[in-house]
Amino acid sequence: MSNHKDYRCYGLRLLTVTAVFLALIAGFNGFFDPYQVIGTPTIKGLNQVKREKDIQVRLFKAVAVNKIEAKSLFLGSSRTEFGLDTHHPGLSDLQPGYNLAITGGNMYEVRRYFDHAIATQPEVKEIILSLDFFMFNQAKKNTPDFREERLGTRNLFVGDLFEVLLSKPAFISSLRTLKNSFSRPNNPGFFYEDGRRNPDSTIEQVYFNQGVIPRFRMVLRDFLVRPDLYGTYQLSVDYLNDLNAVITTSQQRGIRLHLFISPSHALQWEAIRVAGLWSEFEAWKRALVNLSPIWDFSGYNSMTTEAIADPMQYYIESSHYRKELGDLVLNRILDYRPETVPSDFGILLTPTNLETHLEQIRRDRELWAQENPKWVEFVEALKP
């Protein structure tokens, strides 16, 4: 009988210690809230710098968009995250807005975040969706931090709640949040409050303050090597269907939907050519236009051919453009101060003008290549 009581007491003590330990961990992580999903008030010098949000983009954005009653949204990949500002004056009557683009997303993920937004944000009136070639690659699978269960609801998914309060990664992120908040209290982190990425933090933390040419080289090599980018490519019918679902739902809901192809730098389009995917690139555009008119900012125009030198006005590297260029994109799409936009930047593609436009890009490419053999060789040298 005595042994039985001893075991019982031991078990109760163990449960109590475990419960207290877990409560302390949960309280610690809840206070520092490294992914900004709990909503803990911030205290300067302790928990206000949320740089760890970068490792839980899909989680924090799914939660953040629920808090603002958005009237306008941006969707797409990290190109949209960097380039489009929700406070653009052309959207002044559609505030608040939120940049719901997700890093490295495929078209299915983008569609599901669209579904999430319209399920929880009944006031959404306008959506601007950026489309990228790699988003439609059959090899581009859902990222590990994508979870269906967190979408379509305003409530925090139980699995996510465990992840942010009791997991080891969250504890490490909380410690880093304390360190970052204490050592650099005025640092905005990787994201602004409206979901747009901070290019300065990315250049510092991801590219380690390397110059623009090393950044171009790093990104282009990555695109040429990775099979889910340009390493291999097969246009996904399923992803085209996902886009069509977004178009159809927007029409049914009375949401103004603008589609556009990102204005990455000319060297990014050279990488597609070097990868042997130019015909697939054009086939992708044909497939898009078959679904809806779409603004095309790609190609070798007066903006995408900006000279490569430190510093660059419009580009972080070959793939990502800055807000300064994104403002011109929005000027064109929203017909806001159109006189500020170069005439060759942003063409609305329809079945009527598509083939002529594709031919013009080929001619522009030949002229650019003749004038820039150094950069043609630069990209060709990166081919694996």
Where are these regions (language model features)?
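Membrane-embedded segments
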Residues: 69, 75-163
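C-terminal regions of proteins
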Residues: 282-384
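Hydrophobic membrane-insertion alpha-helices, especially the h-region
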Residues: 12-33
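Active-site segments of SGNH/GDSL-like serine hydrolases
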Residues: 249-273
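Short extracytoplasmic
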Residues: 47-74
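Alpha-helical transmembrane signal-anchor/signal-peptide segments
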Residues: 32-54
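Small-residue-rich helix-loop
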Residues: 274-275, 279
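Secreted/periplasmic serine-hydrolase-like ester/acetyl group-modifying domain
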Residues: 131, 140, 144-252, 344-384
